Amino acid sequence: MADQDQNTQQTGSEAPAFNLQRVYLKDLSVEMPNAPHIFLEQEGPAVEVTINVGGQRLAETVFESTVTVTVTTRVNDKVLYLVEGTQAGIFELANIPPEQMDPILGIVCPTMLYPYLRANVADAITRTSLPALHLTEVNFQALYEQRLAEMAQQQEQSADSGIILPPSATRQ
């Protein structure tokens, strides 16, 4: 009976665990370099949005995941505003198979963080007295697959160039 209890406890402690421990706004900046003169422009703005995903290991089973957005809005080639924000989260990932770690950190974690980032960016833009910009949904799976394809292409080009990179140089 005692052996069964120990086996149950071991199995329980070895079960995969995925927990969001904290969500926080790591960085947010708003610049309006051409204010107040830009407010006199009559043309509609052109919006450019770039999104990046990152992360780092903080402890054996604790990771920080980040989603960074840069929004540049221009009117007649003049910057109306530039917003840069990074939303971060601390996640516990224990007993996860190694082949699942990268997809979890590159897809699942950013998907959980992005709604917070969207709200923070919309709020920051509203505080400039301009209409809020509501960022569209992002398919982080497609973004992850695109990143994998780019990395594979870089490795292929490196192999063709005769330059040998250490394995750590090809990982992001």
Curated annotation (Swiss-Prot):
InterPro entries per the UniProt record, alphabetical: SecB, SecB-like_sf
Subcellular location: Cytoplasm
Entry keyword set: Chaperone, Cytoplasm, Protein transport, Translocation, Transport
GO biological process: one example: protein tetramerization
Pfam families assigned: SecB
Record-level GO cellular component terms: cytoplasm
Gene Ontology MF terms: unfolded protein binding
Organism superkingdom: Bacteria
Family statement drawn from the similarity comment of this UniProt entry: Belongs to the SecB family.
NCBIfam families on file: PRK05751.1-5, secB
Function: One of the proteins required for the normal export of preproteins out of the cell cytoplasm. It is a molecular chaperone that binds to a subset of precursor proteins, maintaining them in a translocation-competent state. It also specifically binds to its receptor SecA.
Subunit and interaction comment: Homotetramer, a dimer of dimers. One homotetramer interacts with 1 SecA dimer.
HAMAP family (UniProt xref): SecB
The protein, known as: Protein-export protein SecB
Organism: Bordetella avium (strain 197N)
